[in-house]
């Protein structure tokens, strides 16, 4: 009799767990957050804010502060390669300082770029204004392509912060999935 009761309790708990996953998905279990139609896992040392700017989904920064920022864009114009080329052209560098990687997964394609040099801060308001240059800067860029949508992640900051956050950046972009 006790064994049947224990078996019944275990079966009910298991069914409850399966129902929870069916209704809520696994994002909460794995610590993933959501914005619009994607989910992502945020590194412990980062803060995310939903952006009110056009095309931007998230603006991310370090909890500790520092000259480092990450932006997650959705469906901006251009292909993965065109956007990576645009990011590369925002830097004064030698081509030997650019590392690009392309990765094919079952449901998405991921392209990444890493580079270091002098950053020419884009001025979207006045393109004729003198360029603001920031030396000893780096960029980590990622493009995540799904069947019918594309997401861009761009991190810019001081070289040491970019290098220290490369692993977090890669974990973040690989965690992005459609809901």
How would you describe each model-predicted region?
Residues 110-112:
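Conserved hydrophobic/aromatic beta-strand scaffold that supports enzyme active sites
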Residues 2-107, 116-140, 144-179:
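N-terminal targeting sequences that direct proteins away from the cytosol to non-cytosolic compartments
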């Amino acid at each position: 009799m006790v064994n049947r009761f224990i078996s019944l309790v275990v079966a009910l708990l298991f069914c409850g767990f399966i129902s929870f996953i069916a209704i809520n998905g696994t994002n909460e279990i794995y610590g993933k957050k959501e914005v619009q139609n994607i989910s992502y896992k945020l590194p412990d040392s980062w803060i995310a804010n939903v952006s009110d700017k056009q095309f931007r989904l998230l603006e991310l920064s370090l909890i500790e502060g520092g000259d480092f920022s990450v932006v997650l864009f959705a469906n901006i114009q251009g292909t993965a390669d065109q956007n990576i080329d645009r990011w590369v052209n925002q830097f004064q560098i030698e081509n030997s300082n650019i590392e690009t990687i392309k990765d094919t997964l079952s449901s998405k394609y991921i392209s990444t770029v890493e580079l270091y040099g002098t950053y020419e801060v884009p001025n979207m308001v006045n393109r004729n204004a003198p360029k603001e240059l920031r030396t000893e800067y780096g960029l980590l860029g990622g493009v995540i392509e799904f069947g019918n949508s594309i997401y861009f992640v761009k991190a810019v900051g001081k070289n040491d912060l970019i290098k220290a956050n490369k692993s977090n950046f890669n974990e973040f972009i690989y965690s992005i999935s459609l809901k």
